[in-house]
Every structure is written in C-alpha cells, then in structure tokens.
C-alpha cells in the first residue's frame, strides 16, 4: 500500500496584503509497506519518504538549486552513481527488492526499512538551509545512515560553500578552527596524527572540510558521514561552530554574516 500527501507549509489563509515568501515549500510524503508489519516476528518492509517541494515566482535559480539537491539526496546514495527516476520509484524498487528476497528466502522473516527525510530548518535572512537523512536497513550486521546539510543564498541562488563564507585568505584559519573542534569531538590531542588514528587516510592524514555544511541560527553545522573520512566503525562526526567562534572570519557580504550579528 502506498500513500502520498501534499500539504503547503505556508498559511493558505494569510491575508491578501501579506507579502509572499521568496520561496514557497510544499511538504510531500510517501509511505509504503509490504508484509505483516504489525507483527514483530513477521517479514515486513517499510518505506517513509518526506521532502519539501520548492516553488518561487521571483527566485527561480535558488528554487531550482534546492530542487536538485533534494533530488540528489532522495534518489541516490553516497558513492553510488546510479539514481532512481523519482521518489515513487525509490519506494517501488525497495519493495520489489524485498519481494525478490522473500521469494528467494521463503523461510526467513526479514525486516527492511528505508527512510528519506528532508526538512527546511532555516528560511530567513536570505538563506534556506536543508537537513536530510537517509536510513537503510536490508538485513545484515548493520544498516546505513547518512546525514546531509546544505544552505542556499537567495541573492545568488547557489548552494553555499566555504568560499562564500570566508575570504580565500582566511580559509586556512577557518580550516584550523574546524580541525580543532573536530579533534575535541573525537578526543584527539593536537599531537596525535589523524592518519594514525584512522582518519583522513585518503588525504594522507591532512584535515579536510566536509561537503555537508549548514547555516543555522546558532552556528555553522558541519557533518562527516560514515566512510567519508574513516571506517564505518568510527561512525559519523557532527559539530556546530557557534557564530562567535568564526565571526571575525566571515565575509561581511556573505550569506552567514547576518546570522553572526
């Protein structure tokens, strides 16, 4: 059984004199189950997908960039170049794979789950920030969870990267601050090699910034997913830099400047 729902995130009864938001978000939900999911001892597959659909009459470039990023998170997986055609296809393919497994293993009672959830966590001061989660379990020793962050500047329409946040001359100082916080989170003293600790092997132990960065009201959130900079057993690493920590490095005309005031 599959259920899809669409509900606008804004106030549909707002007064006609109220200015329309730069980007309007509708929440789309897809839920699908297969098997006897009410019985914990029975085979079951569950799919839950929730994401925002961005629309705008004035900020088309930003809305398109947001749409592309949401699609990337919903339809693919990190390290896998294949991509499903649509969220409905993601659900259908997962259920089909579950049924194939059941036919090949009729005596087993697998419990499979797939979750794709994307939320708008910031929509103010000319910035939209998305937070996304992928969770997959298809049996085995463990499932897989990936977390995503991305911010978009409405003024340019582009996804924000480190060069939008700090000037090139300050990138080294910014990276040093992030590394310091990373080491605190991982309890690695400055004297300990990251490579010897099992991190950043692909860069020879040299610290690197993550692809996932998000502007929030409280600070800049950065996230490293499993396998991104270490083995799966090391788990993910997430940290938030309070704005006072990096305020002196921020571009005064950049998308994060207004949040740090």
Language model: regions and residue ranges:
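Compositionally biased intrinsically disordered regions enriched in Thr/Gly
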Residues: 7-261
